[in-house]
């Protein structure tokens, strides 16, 4: 099974109109589910709850630890989904309303908003919007606690080999936005991640 983004869903009921809530229940569920995610050697990125009438969808986003590269495999998504479903089914503080459980991993196009996101993207080409500075296109060479080092790549005419500049270190607090650029060498990987971010699989 290739490393890629995946989504698994456990269907409990049907829904009509959809709304999103942000409340302490999400924090409670994150604390409840995190040990099982860590036991699966994954990182719990986010837990969100979407409500449609009396029905809920619990969306859990998991990722690999920051020192690893690649994507979360479909097998890993399926395994952790089963464990999380069991925990939710036996949650003593649950109000008993029906729910769907959706477990997914971040897509390659997610914004790089935390240091761990930059660690996960090591070696990738990124486009960076710098506060009070020029926008940069470069490859991530290394990531520290407070900054990222890029090897700039200067865009040239079509058909010409890109020119690399000297490494430059940018503090995270000077980065307004960062995003991975899709390269031809990563097209297959990106296509798999996009594919598995689509319709859910039954758990």
Curated annotation (Swiss-Prot):
Highest taxon, organism lineage: Bacteria
Gene Ontology annotations of biological process type: ribosomal small subunit assembly; translation
GO CC aspect terms: cytosol
Keyword line: Cytoplasm, Ribosome biogenesis
SUPFAM superfamilies with a match to the protein in the record: YhbC-like, C-terminal domain, YhbC-like, N-terminal domain
InterPro entries (alphabetical): Ribosome_maturation_RimP, RimP_C, RimP_C_sf, RimP_N, RimP_N_sf
Cytoplasm recorded as keyword: yes
Gene3D superfamilies with a match to the protein in the record: RimP-like superfamily, N-terminal
One Pfam family matching this protein: RimP_N
Cell compartments where the protein resides: Cytoplasm
Spans annotated as Disordered: 1-23
Residue ranges, compositional bias (Polar residues): 1-21
Described function: Required for maturation of 30S ribosomal subunits.
Family: Belongs to the RimP family.
Protein name: Ribosome maturation factor RimP
Gene: rimP
